[in-house]
Amino acid sequence: NQAGPTTQLSWLMPPGPAGQRSFALKKTRPAIKLEMMARRDAASGQFDLTDAGQPVLRYNYATIAPGDVVAKVDAANRIYAQARSDYIHPLFGLNGETLTQDWSVDHPHHRGIYCAWPEVDWRGQRGDLHALQHVFARPTGECKPTSGPVFAQIEAENVWLWENGESLVNERAIIRAYHA
């Protein structure tokens, strides 16, 4: 017998006289409708959460390069137009309106919703995960979407790298949205 995932089965004993009773276990399809969906977009590598088919948010897990945005950013702010990942954008309101912004021309390092430490000291140097200077969050490839009737979630692993080289922090992000 190989070790594997276990399942627990529970039931209430029906009323009746003591003695031997027979039960039949039947496998049926769940009657529960999966309202909340979390899935990876194959084209972009990002993860989308939806509620009854309506968009809730996009988790930008795969690294996004600035692309054409760099040309629009003034020379003083160009150093902040760096490739980034590990953030939410867009986040949608209950009426479908976009609540976040990305790639601002005057602050190109600002991005939707993200967690970042503004000053990271490493081997005598100072980096800034918020301003994308020397420290960058990068996906490890371990990202698990979960869908269900009550909530959808994304459990993602990222690593904070110094100059995209040495690993500083292993981050586990859990993003969960509940059915409206």
Q: What annotation goes with each model-predicted range?
A:
Residues 36-43, 155-180:
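Acidic, contiguous internal or C-terminal segments within carbohydrate-active enzymes
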